[in-house]
Amino acid sequence: MAVETVVATPEDNDPWINAQRQFDAAADVLHLEPGIRAILREPQRELSVNFPVRMDDGSVEVFRGYRVQHNVNRGPAKGGIRFHPQVTLNEVRALSMWMTWKCAVAGIPFGGAKGGVIVDPGRLSHDELERLTRRYATEISLLIGADRDIPAPDVNTTPEVMAWIMDTVSMSEGYSIPAVVTGKPLSVGGSEGRNAATGRGCAMVAHQVCARLGLDPRRLTAAVQGFGNVGSIAARLMARDGFSIRAVSDAYGGIHSEVALDIPAVVEHTRRTGSVVGFPGARPVTNAELLELPVDVLVPAALENQITAANAGRVQATLVLEGANGPTTPDAEEILVRRGVTVVPDIVTNAGGVIVSYFEWVQDLQSFFWSEREINERLGRILTRAFDASWEASERLGVSLRLGAYAVAVQRVAEATSDRGIFP
């Protein structure tokens, strides 16, 4: 495979510009009516908040957070909350738009939203993290609600964080509202299968695309960037299903082996040490190096903007499964597609999380819960429909798999927008 070298521009790494470029490409293919196009190209609501938190030493620090609702024409807004020092408004805007398309291509009745706080949670004590979470939840309570906007876990947020948000909103209203967030512990209305849903969905999509391409997973090597909730579960399930996982990484670095890694052992090593780094029998690699390893399948499952125009020409994998949101920039994807690389987009690959969040929301509203087996069966059916619709649109329109998925999603949201009309 030929190597291309391109210098990335600043715009190439702005997630909001990239999200709008992806939307514009789909709007062009669909010949979207100008008014609908203008509506869908921008977020519907944006809330920026600056809020104080009392620290353990008695001092007060002020944090900035966001909640953005991109579109609610197909139902309540849905999207995670991330705690990260590099959160920006443009990032949250992009993530909210991607959630709109993700829910639409999956055929679940939600619009898209996202939230974030600019903070390094690793430097907070447990009590400080709880106080920050509860104050942020109070600040965005103007927007969130079980029938308005339902948050969920994302980067550096956990089921415990979701329980704090649920409790904060419930205390404000005077009664328990479990459906206000998803991704909660089972004890307070969480769903079986939710914690593993995104990684499980990624592994399911890996099998679906292999079937379409006539590939045998048992003959394929893979590398997974990001060994958190999504990447570790995807790696474990893909290894179980026959893929030879040769490399994994986390925020501290990565490991690579010439033979298949023992993923359960890597998980245990990470539990004990806090990182995959130093796993016995594997050589160290950086996150950047992992993306360019000689493997068949690459699963970027960390943060956005990992595969850019600057390194896309050196990616050796022939199949990219986007476990993270926005890991491949539009310019990078053009290079990959030109080189014959199949890219399965994030709005399909990592949709398992929001699909099972939908199940959790439905179960909370009905106070009737399903078994993990029932959850996983329903997840498989919905993901298969979403993948098949995207693949068939790609072939029908003669476009990339991402553009096929976007065409399906944007068309569904455009139809809902048109059918509802313009108020007043």
Identify the role of each PLM range:
Residues 6-50:
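Short, Gly/Pro- and small/polar-rich lid/capping loops
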Residues 7-14, 209-210, 314-424:
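Adenosine-phosphate binding glycine-rich loop
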Residues 33-39, 107, 144-153, 175-179, ...:
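Flexible, glycine/charged-enriched surface loops at secondary-structure junctions
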